[in-house]
Regions:
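Peripheral, non-AAA+ core regions of ATP-driven protein-machinery
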Residues: 18-24, 35, 164, 239-242, ...
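Residue-level preference for the first positions of well-ordered beta-strands
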Residues: 53-55, 83, 140-144, 192
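A short alpha->loop->secondary-structure connector
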Residues: 101-108, 159-168, 210-215
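Phosphate-binding/switch region of NTP-binding enzymes
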Residues: 168-284
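Catalytic P-loop NTPase motifs of RecA-like helicase/translocase cores
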Residues: 93, 151-152, 202-203
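Terminal-proximal interaction/regulatory segments of ATP-powered molecular machines
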Residues: 289-334
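Phosphate-binding/switch loop-helix module in NTP-utilizing enzymes
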Residues: 114-190
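The Walker A/P-loop phosphate-binding site
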Residues: 2-107, 119, 124-128
Length: 334
């Protein structure tokens, strides 16, 4: 044991420790949706990892940007002194959009990036600046890359300017390199990161299969990969948001290939906090759904009424029971 301590002392730094001294407390970023928290962490009171990369992938118009902004809003609300660096590759995020989501404009930095190399450099510089600060001066920070699929490369731009009609074979290697450097740095700094990405249909697959663009770099780097698909949510004839099906394609914190449906509003409400809990309670036998109404405390109530007055039905005792069901349904080893 003295020999190991000597090794740690001689070759180590702040991040080299005996296994017994490692802080094993998993930190989470509440997403704003209890059921989505359960899907990605195994607990409705959890969320996305507080120091790892979470990938949110889906086809065009599945609400990836709105989904990311909803998580950012919740992160900033939960951390009044926190801030977010939002790497925007599509010029899709503007002042009015951010304000419409109820996000504090003073604590969100939008960084426009065009190439993978530019994103890599700026992200690494930001993490290094953060790590150089004394630990007690580090304010909670979050990164978002929206989206990986739209990043170009220096070679692709140079070839286009020189009218070279050749395919860029460097992109996937550059993506791998960028995330190789970022993954550990983000973990050391306790900075969570959300990366949105496009998906495409795999041609020739025996069963319909979706795959993320950009090669395998993000696939290996991400702690959690969520695939999104959606349908419109209407209030009368007006489309007010999306009902989004979220499925875990990869997860180190919860079971894979599980799916839930969450409701995402287009306005400042963002993710509906309680949507999906009725279905979770039904799975765990807390209540029954009879002809579209839920039997709760001897009363039959429509889901719309329950979700309109959630505090009346989802009491602290009920939430604890739902958390136990979520652990059974989504956690490894259950």
């Amino acid at each position: 044991m003295d020999f190991l301590k000597e090794i740690v002392k001689e070759i180590g730094d702040d991040y080299t420790k005996l296994a017994r001294d490692i802080d094993d407390t998993e930190k989470y970023v509440d997403t704003g949706s209890y059921i989505f928290n359960g899907l990605v962490s195994g607990s409705i009171f959890g969320g996305v990892s507080g120091n790892k990369i979470t990938a949110i992938a889906g086809e065009s118009s599945t609400g990836k940007t709105f989904f990311s902004l909803a998580v950012v809003k919740n992160f900033l609300d939960a951390n009044p002194d926190g801030y977010c660096l939002y790497f925007d590759t599509e010029a899709a995020v503007n002042k009015s959009l951010i304000a419409s989501r109820g996000i504090d404009l003073e604590r969100l930095v939008v960084v426009n990036v065009v190439t993978i190399e530019e994103f890599r450099t700026k992200a690494l510089k930001a993490v290094d600046i953060y790590l150089k600060k004394p630990e007690d001066e580090r304010r909670p920070c979050m990164f978002v890359l929206d989206s990986l699929g739209m990043l170009s490369t220096e070679k692709e731009i140079t070839d286009a300017l020189n009218d070279k009609q050749v395919r860029d074979m460097t992109k996937s290697q550059l993506v791998k390199g960028a995330f190789r450097m970022l993954t550990l740095k983000l973990g050391q700094a306790n900075i969570p990161m959300i990366v949105t990405n496009h998906t495409y249909d795999v041609i020739g697959a025996y069963v319909p299969t979706k795959e993320m663009g950009g090669g395998s770099g993000l696939k290996y780097a991400a702690s959690t990969i969520i695939y999104l698909s959606k349908k419109k949510e209407k209030d009368g004839t007006t489309v007010v948001g999306n009902l989004i099906k979220a499925k875990t394609a990869k997860s180190r914190l919860s079971k894979e290939n599980k799916d839930v449906t969450v409701r995402l509003y287009y306005d400042e409400r963002g993710l509906d906090r309680y949507y999906g809990l009725l279905e979770l309670g039904e799975i765990g036998g807390l209540w029954k759904n009879v002809a579209g109404r839920y039997e709760i405390d001897g009363k039959k109530v429509y889901a719309k009424q329950i979700l309109k007055e959630p505090d009346s039905y989802f009491t602290p005792e009920v939430m604890e029971k739902l958390d136990e069901i979520a652990k059974e349904e989504f956690s490894y080893g259950s």
